[in-house]
Amino acid sequence: MADRLTQLQDAVNSLADQFCNAIGVLQQCGPPASFSNIQTAINKDQPANSTEEYAQLFAALIARTAKDIDVLIDSLPSEESTAALQAASLYKLEEENHEAATCLEDVVYRGDMLLEKIQSALADIAQSQLKTRSGTHSQSLPDS
């Protein structure tokens, strides 16, 4: 996973791509403007509603990417962060890490206990199958 600065750069690049694509679609689908009595043929092949759909699509993409950029910027450490604040934050993270490690150890212990029970049950099943088979073989053999 990339660090936050790389994610931020990727989001800014994505936003720039979306702006370029939106401008390209507007140039392609938009009606021509009239300049000083110059007559041009209007391309009527393009339906008007597709232009609106493109506008809505690009507006949604640009808004979502801008929101992602805001979230990434907010997650960056601030310049006002003092050494004491950073130490407190680090201490809190270490506590959370310790709690998660304790929880993980408990889950692993319970998993090991379940594994032992399953292995014991499988061994019992295998033993009973062996006894059943050996009992059937001894009964099917004729006595001499």
Curated annotation (Swiss-Prot):
Transmembrane segments: none
Function: Component of the Mediator complex, a coactivator involved in the regulated transcription of nearly all RNA polymerase II-dependent genes. Mediator functions as a bridge to convey information from gene-specific regulatory proteins to the basal RNA polymerase II transcription machinery. Mediator is recruited to promoters by direct interactions with regulatory proteins and serves as a scaffold for the assembly of a functional preinitiation complex with RNA polymerase II and the general transcription factors.
Entry keywords, A to Z: Activator, Nucleus, Transcription, Transcription regulation
Subunit (UniProt): Component of the Mediator complex, which is composed of MED1, MED4, MED6, MED7, MED8, MED9, MED10, MED11, MED12, MED13, MED13L, MED14, MED15, MED16, MED17, MED18, MED19, MED20, MED21, MED22, MED23, MED24, MED25, MED26, MED27, MED29, MED30, MED31, CCNC, CDK8 and CDC2L6/CDK11. The MED12, MED13, CCNC and CDK8 subunits form a distinct module termed the CDK8 module. Mediator containing the CDK8 module is less active than Mediator lacking this module in supporting transcriptional activation.
Keyword field contains Transcription: yes
Localization of this protein: Nucleus
Record's protein name: Mediator of RNA polymerase II transcription subunit 21
Predominant localisation class: nucleus
